[in-house]
Regions:
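C-terminal catalytic histidine-bearing segment of alpha/beta-hydrolase fold enzymes
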Residues: 41, 299-334
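N-terminal cap/lid segment of alpha/beta-hydrolase-fold proteins
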Residues: 77-126
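Gly/Ser-rich "nucleophile elbow"/oxyanion-hole loop immediately N-terminal to the catalytic nucleophile
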Residues: 126, 184-227
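Short beta-strand/loop motif that positions the catalytic acidic residue
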Residues: 270, 276-278, 282
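Acidic catalytic loop of the alpha/beta-hydrolase fold
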Residues: 280-285, 314-315
Length: 334
């Protein structure tokens, strides 16, 4: 197999900067037939060489904090009790499966506000369990307009059909909260610790919003991270103990961030039940990165599960994904 860079006209925008494993002779309508005129035939040689990817650091590289140091470190992630001052921007009931609401709330930091998208199942009676969603990297780089966002893009409508509400916060740095100036890769890494802190605050405000609604079940809230949202989720699970469990699609640990920001230092402190669904041929999140996350957490073996499918990064086999996800949620719901 070789690696194909980029995406077709009818594929997600984020594929423009991603690679996917495909046979070298693949000439589907998405890949086409590519030609090049080389001034020197030797210029072609590097294209046949193996591609080296950065492997995760050995677990011995990381040194968990002592309880005393962690207590001090945790102070920067403490929540605030500022009022939500929520404002309903609109409610759209045109979809046959769900009602969509866009709600604006205060974040409690930098005088910023955050939109929360709420997708509630139609004809639902009683309190609805909740799934808080954190999407992939394209929502931080090439996002759609916030009013165009819906769970159907990732095939998450099965959650709504099963009676769950999907809540999609406009996480700091994503959607209509992207930085006004593009950051360099170096700046992005330096800013990551602050971004984690903002995400924790965004999570706390999202829980406050859920608690303010009589039709949502604050005692049955699950986390769903997909790709980016399943790679950089450690602090989310560490500092928010109200999650009943976490669904992590094509996630793991990335080796490119400093130890204090990538979260591995803190993983033994995580005890949240979780389900990981990954692809065997995922070149973006290799198996070693997924297993590093799985093996490093403090979650008991009986409360965590990982499955590798015969797939790349995304999509995963839909029927199996639905079956495993709903089974996990049912197991850990009240």
């Amino acid at each position: 197999r070789g690696l194909t860079l980029g995406g077709g006209f009818n594929e997600p925008k984020y594929l423009a900067t991603q690679t996917s494993p495909k046979p070298r002779i693949d000439r589907s309508e998405l890949n086409g037939f590519r030609t090049a005129r080389l001034i020197n035939p030797r210029d072609l040689n590097p294209f046949g060489d193996p591609i080296k990817t950065q492997a995760p650091k050995d677990i011995s590289f990381y040194k968990p904090m002592s309880d005393e140091v962690f207590k001090v470190y945790s102070r920067s992630f403490e929540g605030n009790s500022s009022p939500l001052n929520q404002e309903l921007k609109y409610k759209d009931d045109s979809h046959p499966l769900w009602n969509k609401e866009r709600v604006l709330v205060n974040t409690g930091y930098n005088n910023e506000k955050m939109d929360i998208l709420v997708f509630t199942p139609k004809n639902n009676f009683g309190k609805s369990p909740v799934v808080i969603f954190h999407p992939g990297a394209n929502y931080y780089t090439t996002p759609p307009e916030i009013d165009e966002v819906g769970p159907g893009e990732f095939g998450l409508d099965f959650l709504i059909k099963s009676g769950r509400t999907i809540i999609w916060p406009a996480w700091k740095g994503s959607l209509n909260r992207m930085p006004s100036v593009a950051l360099s890769p170096e700046q992005r890494i330096r800013n990551f610790r602050d971004l984690f802190r903002y995400w924790i605050s965004d999570t706390q405000k999202t829980f406050d919003y859920i608690a303010s609604r009589q039709d949502l079940d604050i005692d049955n809230v699950f986390y769903l991270g997909m790709s980016y949202g399943a790679l950089f989720n450690t602090h989310n699970l560490l500092f928010e103990d109200r999650y009943k469990g976490a669904l992590l699609y094509v996630g793991g640990n990335f080796p490119t961030y400093p130890p204090m920001a990538d979260g591995i230092n803190h993983m033994p402190r995580i005890n949240t039940p979780f389900l990981m669904l990954n692809g065997e041929d995922d070149y973006l999140v290799p198996k070693s990165a997924a297993m590093l996350f799985y093996n490093s957490t403090g979650t008991p073996e009986e409360d965590k599960k990982i499955i590798f499918y015969n797939s790349g990064h995304w999509p995963l086999p839909r029927n199996q994904m639905i079956k495993e996800s709903l089974s996990f949620i049912e197991k850990y719901s009240n």
